[in-house]
């Protein structure tokens, strides 16, 4: 189907987003065309502002507008515990329950041979460096309860065993195959309470 070039480019841009197929991209493009210009400009500014002003914390890998992030900078946090998660959205999910007071380490992915993602493609080396520098007594593996998350947790567990650090895994109150970011606070809280040593 023929669209004027500006609409085609907008549709193509929307299709670059995860979960957006051709039909949804067309629907979004026409929705944007019907929005007031000031709303569209605010939306565009928000996109540019986020891209320009957000970075990843050099310590934990969480998304932040200043380095180090507010969590790593907080002196009241328990620095003897690091919770390892796959994605910055998982940090936000954990923080919502307001029960965990340690630090985080964001892997930015999980081991997935089917997708060509190996241990060297995620932030495992950075985690090992942190364990050398900090007085960490426990590492909580809070990767997603799916095949990739489990494989990643087991890989990290084997790497960390010789260090003598206590290694725990969050309990499976979370649905297998689900993502941490979609879990409610009560489920996350129970999963954290029921973590087990590996």
Curated annotation (Swiss-Prot):
GO molecular function, one term: zinc ion binding
UniProt keyword annotations, A-Z: DNA damage, DNA recombination, DNA repair, Metal-binding, Zinc, Zinc-finger
Lineage: Bacteria, Bacillati, Bacillota, Bacilli, Bacillales
Acetylation listed as a keyword: no
Annotated Pfam families: RecR_C, RecR_HhH, RecR_ZnF, Toprim_4
Organism: Anoxybacillus flavithermus (strain DSM 21510 / WK1)
Gene that this sequence comes from: recR
Toprim domain residues: 80-175
Function summary: May play a role in DNA repair. It seems to be involved in an RecBC-independent recombinational process of DNA repair. It may act with RecF and RecO.
InterPro entries: DNA_Rcmb_RecR, Rcmb_RecR, Rcmb_RecR_Znf, TOPRIM_dom, TOPRIM_RecR
Protein name, per record: Recombination protein RecR
C4-type zinc finger segments: 57-72
Biological processes per GO annotation: DNA recombination; DNA repair
Protein family: Belongs to the RecR family.
């Amino acid at each position: 189907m023929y669209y004027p070039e500006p609409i085609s480019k907008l549709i193509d841009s929307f299709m670059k987003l995860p979960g957006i197929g051709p039909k949804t991209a067309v629907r979004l493009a026409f929705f944007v065309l019907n929005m007031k210009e000031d709303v569209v400009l605010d939306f565009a500014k928000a996109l540019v502002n986020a891209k320009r002003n957000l970075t990843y914390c050099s310590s934990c890998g969480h998304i932040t507008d200043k380095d180090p992030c507010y969590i790593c900078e907080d002196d009241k946090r328990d620095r003897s515990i690091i919770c390892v998660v796959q994605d910055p959205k998982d940090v936000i999910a954990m923080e919502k329950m307001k029960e965990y007071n340690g630090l985080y380490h964001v892997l930015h992915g999980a081991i997935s041979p089917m997708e060509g993602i190996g241990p060297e493609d995620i932030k495992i080396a950075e985690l090992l460096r942190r364990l050398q520098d900090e007085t960490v007594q426990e590492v909580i593996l809070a990767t997603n309860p799916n095949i990739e998350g489990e494989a990643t947790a087991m890989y990290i567990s084997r790497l960390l065993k010789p260090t003598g650090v206590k290694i725990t895994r969050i309990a499976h109150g979370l649905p297998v195959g689900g993502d941490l970011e979609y879990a409610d606070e009560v489920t996350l809280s129970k999963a954290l309470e029921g973590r087990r040593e590996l």
